[in-house]
Structures are given as C-alpha cells and as structure tokens.
C-alpha cells in the first residue's frame, strides 16, 4: 500500500483556506515539485538529482520517481541518457507550437461550449471572471512579486478559461486543453514577472472582459477570434521576453 499523508488542499492557499486532504506521498511530492517548477525554483534544463529532491521533499526514491515520471508525461521534465531527470528547457519554437495547438483545441471547445451554454454555465463563467479580477488586483497591489498571490492568480486564470469551454461536452477536448494550459503556464509565469519589471503595456483584464462579453452574448465567431488573439498576444510577449539578453532577462 502506498504511504498517505494529510496535506493542505491543492487550492487552499489560493482560496485562503486551511482545509486538508488525504493523499499519497507521491501525489504530495508531485504537487510540491510541480509548484516549484512553475515558480521558477529550478532553472530550465537543470538536473534533478534524486538525493537533493529527497532532502527537499522527503520520502523515498520510489514516490519521487513516480512524481518525476508523471511530470515527464506532462512534458515538465525530461529524461537524460543516464536515466536521470532534468527540467524541460524553454524555447520559442516549442512555445509557439503549444500556443497554436492550444488555439485549435480551445477555439473548437469554445464554439461547442457556446452552442450548449445555459444559465448555469453563464453563472459559473461570470463568477470565474470576477474571481479572476479580484486575484489580479491583489497580485498587482502586492509591493513585490509574491508567489502565493501569483499561485492564486494562476488558479483563478485557469478556472476562467476552463469555464469558457466548460460546456463543450467533450472530455477529450477538456483534457487536451488542460495539458496545453500547463505547458503555456511554464512560459507565462516568468514572462509575467519580466513584463512587470520592464513595463510591457497590456491590459489583460480588458481582454478577459471582452471574452466574457462575447461568450455571454453567445457570439461564437467573435469569442473564438478574441481567444485566438488573446493567446497570440501572450505568445508575442513571451517571445520578446525570451529574446532578451540573458543578463537583462534575469535582472
């Protein structure tokens, strides 16, 4: 039997709550390691030595390997020729590929979602938008980039985009969308930090509001066009950040 632990709910920090849940040790390590990858605790391409991970997250090598293999399936880490693991590198080409694939998947899912939309779907979407707006205000008001605020913002951001396509009635589309979201999150989070530092002008809140308005109006064509433009603008910001000289990007 796999060892189990009591751990804070995955969304507890984002919600400001203190709930706990019973999960396997492997699941706990997976969540902690994935969170740290998203927060930039490990550099792209960095080797992940099992002993160092054991010291950082606890447990034996077996649940650590389980967590790493799960992250490998999500393309967060890659294997090396010596059967080790390292953080997956970041590249403009991969980011663009993920972005364009995400547009194909999410725009199709959005059109289907709007065709099936009802009052309950609209209520969830409006609620997700307001929760996202609140999280964005808290994150922007913080005197410095705060990991907990950024985690909460990312959780609310994902929930809004999930709500948009939530009525598509296709588990495959929803699953593929979630995978692609995770891939773009790896790029988007460090890019947000750099964009804040260098003052890239973009009102993402207005983009989300326009998406909400088009979706609530059941205007599938406009909503899909806005979603594609939203993703491509994000890709352009990320590409500019990745193209900065190494020293400047790390400043």
Write out the residue ranges for each language-model feature.
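Short linear motifs at protein or domain termini
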Residues: 1-115, 240-251
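C-terminal all-alpha effector/ligand-binding and dimerization domain
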Residues: 2-11, 21, 186-251
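Amphipathic alpha-helical repeat elements characteristic of tetratricopeptide repeat
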Residues: 27, 103, 126, 202-206
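Short, hydrophobic secondary-structure boundary micro-motifs
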Residues: 45-46, 80, 173-177, 193, ...
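Short, flexible turn/loop "capping" segments at secondary-structure junctions
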Residues: 79, 157, 203-204
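A ubiquitous short alpha-helical element
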Residues: 90-96, 114-118, 143-149, 191-199
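Conserved amphipathic alpha-helical segments that form helical-bundle/coiled-coil interaction surfaces
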Residues: 119-190, 207-214, 222-234
């Amino acid at each position: 039997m796999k060892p189990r632990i009591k751990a804070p709910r995955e969304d507890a920090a984002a919600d400001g709550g203190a709930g706990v849940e019973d999960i396997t040790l492997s699941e706990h390590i997976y969540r902690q390691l994935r969170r740290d990858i998203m927060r930039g605790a490990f550099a792209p391409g960095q080797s992940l030595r099992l002993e160092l991970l054991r010291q950082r997250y606890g447990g034996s090598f077996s649940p650590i390997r389980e967590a790493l293999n799960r992250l490998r399936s999500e393309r967060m880490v890659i294997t090396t020729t010596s059967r080790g693991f390292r953080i997956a590198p970041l590249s403009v080409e991969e980011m663009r590929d993920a972005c364009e694939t995400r547009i194909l998947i999410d725009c199709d899912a959005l059109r289907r979602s709007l065709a099936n939309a009802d009052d309950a779907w609209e209520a969830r979407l409006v609620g997700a938008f307001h929760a996202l707006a609140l999280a964005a205000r808290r994150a922007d008001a913080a005197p410095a980039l705060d990991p907990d605020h950024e985690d909460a913002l990312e959780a609310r951001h994902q929930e809004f985009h999930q709500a948009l396509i939530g009525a598509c009635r296709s588990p495959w589309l929803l699953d593929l969308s979630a995978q692609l979201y995770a891939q773009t999150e790896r790029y988007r989070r460090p890019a947000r930090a750099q964009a804040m530092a260098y003052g890239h002008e973009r009102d993402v809140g207005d983009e989300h509001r326009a998406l909400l308005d088009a979706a609530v109006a059941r205007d599938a064509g406009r909503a899909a066009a806005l979603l594609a433009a939203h993703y491509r603008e994000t890709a352009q910001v990320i590409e500019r950040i990745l193209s900065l000289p190494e020293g400047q990007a790390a400043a």
